[in-house]
Amino acid sequence: MCSDGSEYSFYSRDGDSDVAVLFFNGGGACWNDFTCTVENSSSTGAYWQNPTGWGGILDLDNRNNPLIDASMVFVPYCTGDVHMGNATLSYGDNVMHHRGYPNAMSAFDYFISSHPNASTYYVLGSSGGAIAAGFYAGSLSEEIPEANIFVFHDSTGGVTSTGTTDLYPAWGLNNTSFTWLDGLTYNGSSLDWNDMTSAHLDIFLNMYDPDITYGRFDSAQDETMKYFNGLLNNPPEDYNWRLRNSELHIESEGVEMSGWIESGDNHGILFSSWFYQLEDESVSFSDWFTSWLNGEMPEDVWCTDC
């Protein structure tokens, strides 16, 4: 179910290789009267997110697409809860069905039942879907312990919750189940949605399965994420710093990560034609990403004048 009560659906294609991709799409997020009553793209049905004709790794007519032969399940986003909620709340006259978790689980269950023996699993996400990618990658590792898993976060590297918003009742997070997190602690605490950076999720995921491969992409001045970070009581001007600090934090815990930070204010690359156009000092993003897909862990590409 989408946040407006409309029926939810996801998209699937069978490829010609033994590689399987689980892609979580993004959109807006909301958690209170203000954010859930302003116009929000995630409050509309899933039908409009049909990825046919999109760019990046979703462009199935482009032979330069490094995942063109892969099987894929595309998980649309229409619930305002980064694919993680399981609650229905009223905001004034507006009723929001935050049902991202059961929606995503329907796609996830189909994915693992349809591709139980893939040689490599890529769990990818853009925007809000980039947060979900880490959680469902852990569930994939739990379901298929021998799986070769790669996780890529597109455009959420600087997001930080500060405790100013209690996301548990807002999204019904206690009504979800990610049992791979059971018993895991970092600095004496379990993973806490109300006090979490993007680094924490990958650190916990690496504790559970140290064989997972990680990558990320961000824009230093991402206006969308600066806006949402501001709603979480973070100074928007700090976003570029948070991106870098997040990856450094991850790597300080022994987790190897390939990261790209570009200088602009764009939001999301995996679904965009920009995927094939971006270069930095003669390094092509599509070539860099392909190298990451091949397990080569390319060096970080971080903008210096941004």
Label the model's feature ranges.
Residues 1-306:
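C-terminal His-loop and adjacent cap/lid subdomain of alpha/beta-hydrolase
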